[in-house]
């Protein structure tokens, strides 16, 4: 709906502002001024005036006017309502060159309707033209130039005006493409003054330059000379003759000339002195030129008094001076190579080609003369620049001359010293440095008189040999530059050798670069030694081909995976460095950079891991521990060795030999000893029986039950005292275990004695209830340990049985040997021991029976022996019960007692490996 309303308003406005015939009607208003041109940075006011008919139709007045510049609304603060029909707007400090200003009114619905529009043009007024000058080119019309001043930003017209004193010439308007110059269209008249000035005009103003008055002849610019040619002279090799054709104006004015020349390869010109060419001429001879040298010439002219302008330069012309004999001897040097012939040496003579300005002509050949000291001459004619000869080890004098068409040069003299010559007096303070894209060499001259200096240089490379170039300098020179094709980033080895009258001096060398650059690649670092907290890094010096300059320093960058990077600077002379304060068992990343004066280059990155322990740290721990263990072991062995008797007593006590004891002296009736040939013969099968032999008094009339009762008491005493036996029954490692014999009702308290020798003692007397007197024993001289009874005789007492019918029995003494596992199990049952007794074979029984029979026959007679045998055969080796074993012991006692046998001591048990007293 709003769009339709807007369209209707616009259509109505168009209808009201046009006539029915289509012609435009008068606008609703206008802006004054109509087409303003204002000066930059000035103030400007525009007024918009509305017409009455539009005001009545749209019901508006000046309050409804809206000003806009370039479609942007101007703030109302700049508006001024003059009356109901006019409104003005003011601009201050106009900076824009072009402003579109429109006057608009607000109609129905606050719609803006354009009333009128203008363009404000800004600019500057013209400045006064300056530096007006005119030039009269020969054969052409006068042309004037000036300085138009600042830019006005407006269309500005320049007009050149000229007149004589009596005649005014037509104006010359400058063209748009050349606004500061203009050429008049009339012919120039010499020797008549003319007045000239310039007018400048634009929309903001008009100005006129100063007037100048001159004679055109003083503004003449002649045409350049033409047909320039150069001619040489055969008589004089240092001159060239120039000829040319002068311009036609020479008939009007006197000319002077400016002649310049240069060699063909030069870029700068040399000039003939102006006073030599200050008059009109058509030729000139140039002198003091170099022979056989091509020169280029050019020439120009102007009015003699200098008023006017120089002509343009003529076309260039060239010519070559005639030849002359070489002006200088060539540079001459030598090199000595080892010779394969004894007493000779190979000498290579070398020289430099003379430059054209010194050769003064085409070189035909070289003449070399060798003179040995106080000897004949050797002449050589060479077309090359070197000569190789074989010379003796003597001193030689070499001369060199160069020849052209005109003649020979002066001779270059060179002394070749003998092979034993010692060079001395080198130059001092040798320096080399780049400057102005040249490599300069400087030194301090020796005190001795130097004829010349030889400078040699070559490019150092690891891939190619050092090809030497050289040059010669005069003996008075102490600073020069290397004349050759030098390359950047290359290391040059420069050698300076002073040459004296008697031969060369000692050479001095130095390295230098024409221009340095960063290295082509960085050094490769590697580890030489890695420790727990440090690492020794090493690297190789960079090849000279990739250094590109002097290596000033190295920088080592190292870091862990998560740590910050650390940089360490290292002197360039070092090839290894030790990183300290590292962390053990850590991965490190290392790279290295080499730096020249122009920058650095990083090498490849390298990684290494520090060990967890330092070198020798494990050894430092293990070795002391091992030494301590070894020392402890040695001390233990020494202790055991020193205390071997004590240890042996506790671990392996000595078993006393009863045969060497004084036990036999306890009774005045000691039974004879039985000498058995061998235990192996007695018991070849390794088994024997535990036997108890009890001697009973022969005259004892006590009934058998009482005897048994006494025997039971004896057996109980034996069981109770078995653990208190003396050392006679000690352990022996050669003995084997055997069970002891006890009654069946004492199985739980019996002990399994290993290799035990038991003794039973029965004290007999005619009177049973009479206490026997204490026996006195004497100490044996044997070295065997004493028995318990021997050590303590007071313990030996007799047992008196009274009223009860008990027999008199002494305390039973027995001895043990322990060396087997049965010693640790003393609680073995009597039943087990009985089984061992019953397991004796028949052969053992027969052998034992025979032994017992022999013993009884000596002490008791054949009656007792018969009874003992019968009892032993019937009971002791019967079905193998404990009762039977006990019976065997009892019967033996009765037999011994009835026969009145004196008391004796016999072993109860002898096992294989045990000790058996003889």
From Swiss-Prot:
Changing residue 517 to P: In HIES4B; results in impaired cytokine-mediated signaling pathway with loss of response to IL-6, IL-11, IL-27 and reduced response to OSM, CNTF and LIF. Two extracellular parts of IL6ST/gp130 linked to the Fc-portions of a human IgG1 antibody (sgp130Fc) inhibit IL6 trans-signaling by the IL6:IL6R complex and has no affinity of IL6 or IL6R alone. Also blocks IL11 cluster signaling through IL11R. Changing residue 404 to Y: In HIES4B; results in defective cytokine-mediated signaling pathway with loss of response to IL-6, IL-11, IL-27, OSM but not LIF. A motif (WSXWS motif) lies at residues 310-314. Residues 660-681, 722-758 are annotated as: Disordered. Disulfide bonds join 28-54, 48-103, 134-144, 172-182, 458-466. Residues 26-120 form the Ig-like C2-type domain. SUPFAM superfamilies: Fibronectin type III. Keywords: Cell membrane, Disease variant, Disulfide bond, Glycoprotein, Host-virus interaction, Immunoglobulin domain, Membrane, Phosphoprotein, Receptor, Repeat, Secreted, Signal, Transmembrane, Transmembrane helix. It is linked to Hyper-IgE syndrome 4A, autosomal dominant, with recurrent infections: An immunologic disorder characterized by recurrent mainly sino-pulmonary infections associated with increased serum IgE. Some patients have onset of symptoms in early childhood and develop complications, including bronchiectasis or hemoptysis, whereas others have later onset of less severe infections. Immunologic workup usually shows normal leukocyte levels, although some patients may demonstrate alterations in lymphocyte subsets, including T cells. PANTHER family: CYTOKINE RECEPTOR (PTHR23036), FIBRONECTIN TYPE-III DOMAIN-CONTAINING PROTEIN (PTHR23036:SF151). Belongs to the type I cytokine receptor family. Type 2 subfamily. Component of a hexamer of two molecules each of IL6, IL6R and IL6ST; associates with the complex IL6:IL6R but does not interact with IL6. Forms heterodimers composed of LIFR and IL6ST (type I OSM receptor) which are activated by LIF and OSM. Also forms heterodimers composed of OSMR and IL6ST (type II receptor) which are activated by OSM but not by LIF. Component of a receptor complex composed of IL6ST/GP130, IL27RA/WSX1 and CNTFR which interacts with the neuroprotective peptide humanin. Interacts with HCK. Interacts with INPP5D/SHIP1. Interacts with SRC and YES. (Microbial infection) The homodimer binds two molecules of herpes virus 8/HHV-8 protein vIL-6. This is Interleukin-6 receptor subunit beta.
